[in-house]
C-alpha cells in the first residue's frame, strides 16, 4: 500500500509548492488533476489549458525532485489516517467491498497481484516515517517514470521543458523489469464468504491472456456479454 500512500503524499507540498497548492494552481486555470494507483503503476494526471503546459511539468518535477523537503511527521500521520479511512469507506464498510480482495488472494496466490493497491491497515499501522521516505527514494526518480504530454503543444518546447525541469533530478536506483510467473489453476476454485449483506453475490473469474494479447479485445466483448449490464447473460 505504500505506492497508494504516496499518491496522497504527493499533493501535500514540496520545496516550492505549498500544501494543496498543486490543486489550486491548476484549478484556478480551469484545469483538473488527480491520481490513481493500480497493481503496476501510479499515475498523476492533469488536464488544463495548453498555455499551462510548462507550469504542469514544473509542478510534477518539483514534487518528484523535492517532495521530501516538504515531508513531515505530521503530514505522514494525517495521510496515514486518510488512507485508513478511505479503505474503510470504500472497501471494509461497503456492501461487497471485500470481494476483490478475496478474489485476488485466491486467483493470484504467491504473485504480486495477491495484494490490492489500497494496502492493508495492519501494514499502515506499523509503517514509519522512515519507511515511506526510503520507499520514495527507491522508486520515485526520472529513470522510473514516463512523462506523457498531449494536446495543443509544440513537441520541441515540451522536450526543452522536460529537460529543464526533470534533467537535474537525481535518479533512483536502477529498476529491473520483473515478470513473475503467471499463476496456473489446475482445478476450479470455489470460495464462499459471509458478510452482513441481505442480497447474495456470485462472481466468476476466468484466467485468460495478458494485456495487449491479440485475443484481449474479443475477451473484453465476451465479458460484457456474459456479465456487463442489464442485458447480459
Q: PLM features: residue spans?
A:
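Active-site SXXK
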Residues: 2-14
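Non-catalytic accessory/assembly modules
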Residues: 71-81, 88, 94-104, 126, ...
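Non-catalytic beta-strand/loop surface segments
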Residues: 16-52, 89-144, 168-213, 227-233
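M16/insulysin-pitrilysin zinc metalloprotease superfamily fold
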Residues: 13, 47-79, 228-230
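Buried hydrophobic packing residues in well-ordered domains
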Residues: 4-6, 44, 60, 83, ...
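Zinc-dependent metallopeptidase catalytic helix centered on the HExxH motif
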Residues: 1, 215-217
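Non-catalytic, conformational "gating/processing" segments within enzyme and secreted inhibitor domains
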Residues: 73, 80, 129-165
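Short beta-strands and strand-coil junctions in structured, solvent-facing domains, enriched
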Residues: 53, 66, 70, 155-156, ...
Amino acid at each position: 500500500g505504500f505506492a497508494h500512500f504516496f499518491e496522497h503524499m504527493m499533493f501535500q507540498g514540496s520545496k516550492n509548492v505549498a500544501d494543496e497548492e498543486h490543486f489550486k494552481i491548476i484549478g484556478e486555470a480551469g484545469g483538473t488533476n488527480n491520481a490513481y494507483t493500480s497493481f503496476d503503476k501510479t499515475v498523476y494526471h492533469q488536464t488544463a489549458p495548453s498555455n499551462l503546459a510548462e507550469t504542469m511539468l514544473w509542478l510534477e518535477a518539483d514534487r518528484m525532485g523535492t517532495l521530501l523537503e516538504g515531508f513531515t511527521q505530521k503530514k505522514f500521520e494525517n495521510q496515514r489516517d486518510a488512507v485508513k479511512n478511505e479503505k474503510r469507506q470504500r472497501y471494509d464498510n461497503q456492501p461487497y467491498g471485500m470481494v476483490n480482495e478475496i478474489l485476488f488472494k485466491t486467483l493470484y496466490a504467491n504473485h504480486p497481484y495477491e495484494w490490492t493497491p489500497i494496502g492493508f491497515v495492519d501494514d499502515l499501522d506499523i509503517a514509519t516515517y522512515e519507511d515511506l521516505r526510503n520507499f520514495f527514494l527507491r522508486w520515485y526518480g526520472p529513470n522510473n517514470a514516463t512523462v506523457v504530454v498531449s494536446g495543443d503543444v509544440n513537441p520541441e518546447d515540451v522536450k526543452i521543458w522536460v529537460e529543464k525541469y526533470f534533467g537535474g533530478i537525481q535518479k533512483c536506483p536502477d529498476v529491473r523489469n520483473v515478470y513473475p510467473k503467471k499463476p496456473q489453476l489446475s482445478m476450479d476454485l470455489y470460495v464462499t464468504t459471509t458478510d452482513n449483506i441481505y442480497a447474495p453475490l456470485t462472481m466468476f473469474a476466468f484466467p485468460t491472456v495478458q494485456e495487449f494479447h491479440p485475443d484481449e479485445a474479443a475477451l473484453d466483448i465476451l465479458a460484457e456479454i456474459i456479465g456487463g449490464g442489464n442485458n447480459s447473460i
